[in-house]
């Protein structure tokens, strides 16, 4: 018997059975307990969801921006009222500590919906005078039906981040959460319906990558917003273009540098480094896993990092005192352990962790100890490739030019950060780093107002911020002639 029972699809304002006849299981990564059986969508189900979204979108788009704004604000209220309930589900599904999901996942998702609810009425066109008797005006119109494909590390937050600008601009969305963490997207669908979003405007189809491919290639989808790995993102982008030249937003992986200069406050720097590597058990795309430290302070910095790692409270995610939980799945655990073994084999010095935790209740979960490697080189696998787990690599440097060149020597470009008391150097360095999200003397905050996205192979487009809303609209130009029309023939 599962905890949450059979989970169906959400189409047209309510739950419906999938026609595939197939289900998949989702498990609690802390205990191995079966959480739910989830129905997998078929091609017919995807077609049904898209058709429902088209119908709902027509109604949604005819509402005034103020009406849409009020409905979205009601959804925000419901999310906040149910924060504890949703956080409990998210903790069971992802393995994140309850203190984290209570404070971050639903809160930040609701903040983004509230932000775009406020911007819905600010969508406007331009008037361009041509001559005394003629002018052009532009309209920003919704795209139509968009597809959202979520990642497993922030299920409800990602669903909120993708739906908020889409719905605020008058679009509908068919959303596919990760099959690893599929539960809370359905709860968001319930909330949108209860808030007054018309049936079909937000549909949820469940399944593996084949369902994502059906959405990406669907001729009636106007845009795809995807969060996930680089290689999968390339496939999504290729299929989106080949099928119908869809617009895309890609939030992909990272191998982000954190640069600690010789004048840094070492306590602040160590706090930032530990947060940038071990928050959410290291399963954050923006993690600063390449920690470059000036040679003159490397030993002192490393000691402060290790002191903080010892204070990490690994435990049951449902315990309020826990601040470090399991990895999301057995597959992710195996992947991370493989990287750790690679680091050892290539000569990195293991300073902390490096093992799976199996004592007591840890034995039934996907736990790996917070891991720190020293004496790392740029050519090591643990330094070059995204691990998506709690593995910090410490590298030393001597000069500003050197560390900037090394930090940029990657095909990733999602995030970067510097720690220094010299603000001139901080800004100078940040301006030269090839990354879309940067932090000075802090790490990790992504408020609704801040555009999020990467350079290079870390993504295309942005989420959050004013600019994102524009990418869920298309511009129509209209010329108006008030004077006499002069025929050509």
UniProtKB/Swiss-Prot annotation:
Free-text cofactor note: Binds 2 potassium ions per subunit.
Positions of K(+) 1 binding: 26, 93, 180
Location of Cysteine sulfenic acid (-SOH) modifications: 285
Keyword hit for rRNA-binding: no
Record-stated family: Belongs to the aldehyde dehydrogenase family.
Protein name: Betaine aldehyde dehydrogenase
Database matches in NCBIfam families: BADH, PRK13252.1
Residues forming the catalytic site: 162, 251, 285, 463
Residues noted as binding K(+) 2 in the record, renumbered to the chain: 245, 456, 459
Originating species: Burkholderia orbicola (strain MC0-3)
Biological role: Involved in the biosynthesis of the osmoprotectant glycine betaine. Catalyzes the irreversible oxidation of betaine aldehyde to the corresponding acid.
Disulfide bonds: none
Gene field: betB
A GO biological process held by the record: glycine betaine biosynthetic process from choline
Catalytic reaction(s) noted: betaine aldehyde + NAD(+) + H2O = glycine betaine + NADH + 2 H(+)
Molecular function terms, GO-annotated: betaine-aldehyde dehydrogenase (NAD+) activity; metal ion binding
Subunit structure and binding partners: Dimer of dimers.
Residues the record lists as binding NAD(+): 150-152, 176-179, 229-232, 253, 285, 386
């Amino acid at each position: 018997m599962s905890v949450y029972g059979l989970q169906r699809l959400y189409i047209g304002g309510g739950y419906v059975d999938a026609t595939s006849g197939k289900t998949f299981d989702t498990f609690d990564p802390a205990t191995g307990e079966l959480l739910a059986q989830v129905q997998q969508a078929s091609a017919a189900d995807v077609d049904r969801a898209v058709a429902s979204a088209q119908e709902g979108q027509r109604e949604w788009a005819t509402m005034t921006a103020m009406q849409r704004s009020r409905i979205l604000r009601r959804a925000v209220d419901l999310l906040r009222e149910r924060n504890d309930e949703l956080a409990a589900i998210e903790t069971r599904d992802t393995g994140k500590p309850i203190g984290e999901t209570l404070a971050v996942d639903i809160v930040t998702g609701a903040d983004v919906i509230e932000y775009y609810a406020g911007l819905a009425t600010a969508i406007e066109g331009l008037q361009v005078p041509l001559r005394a008797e003629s002018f052009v005006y532009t309209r920003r119109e919704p795209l139509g039906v968009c597809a959202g494909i979520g990642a497993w590390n922030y299920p409800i937050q990602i669903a909120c981040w993708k739906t908020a600008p889409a719905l605020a601009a008058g679009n509908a969305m068919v959303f596919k959460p990760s099959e690893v963490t599929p539960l809370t997207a359905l709860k968001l669908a319930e909330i949108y319906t209860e808030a007054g979003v018309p049936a079909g405007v937000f549909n949820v189809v469940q399944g593996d990558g084949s369902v994502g491919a059906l959405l990406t290639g669907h001729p009636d989808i106007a845009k795809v917003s995807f969060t996930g790995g680089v290689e999968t993102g390339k496939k999504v982008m290729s299929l989106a273009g080949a099928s119908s030249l869809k617009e895309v937003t890609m939030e992909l992986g990272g191998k982000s540098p954190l640069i600690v200069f010789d004048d840094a406050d070492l306590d602040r720097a160590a706090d930032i480094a530990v947060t940038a590597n071990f928050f959410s058990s290291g399963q954050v795309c923006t993690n600063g896993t390449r920690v470059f430290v000036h040679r003159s302070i490397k030993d002192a910095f490393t000691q402060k990092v290790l002191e903080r790692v010892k204070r990490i409270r690994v435990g049951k995610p449902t315990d309020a005192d826990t601040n470090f939980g399991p990895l999301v799945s057995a597959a992710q655990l195996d992947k991370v352990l493989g990287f750790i073994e690679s680091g050892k084999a290539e000569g990195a010095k293991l300073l902390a962790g490096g093992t799976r935790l199996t004592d007591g209740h840890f034995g039934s979960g996907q736990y790996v100890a917070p891991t720190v490697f020293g004496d790392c080189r740029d050519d090591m696998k643990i330094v070059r490739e995204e691990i998506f787990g709690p593995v910090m690599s410490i590298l030393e440097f001597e000069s500003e030019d050197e560390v900037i060149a090394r930090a940029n020597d990657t095909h990733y470009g999602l995030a970067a950060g510097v720690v220094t008391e010299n603000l001139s150097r901080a800004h100078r360095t940040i301006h030269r780093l090839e990354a879309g999200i940067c932090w000075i003397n802090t790490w990790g905050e992504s408020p609704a107002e801040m555009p999020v996205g990467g350079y290079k192979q870390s993504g295309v487009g942005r989420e959050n911020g004013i600019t994102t809303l524009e990418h869920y609209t298309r511009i129509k130009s209209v010329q108006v002639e008030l004077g006499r029309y002069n025929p050509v023939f």
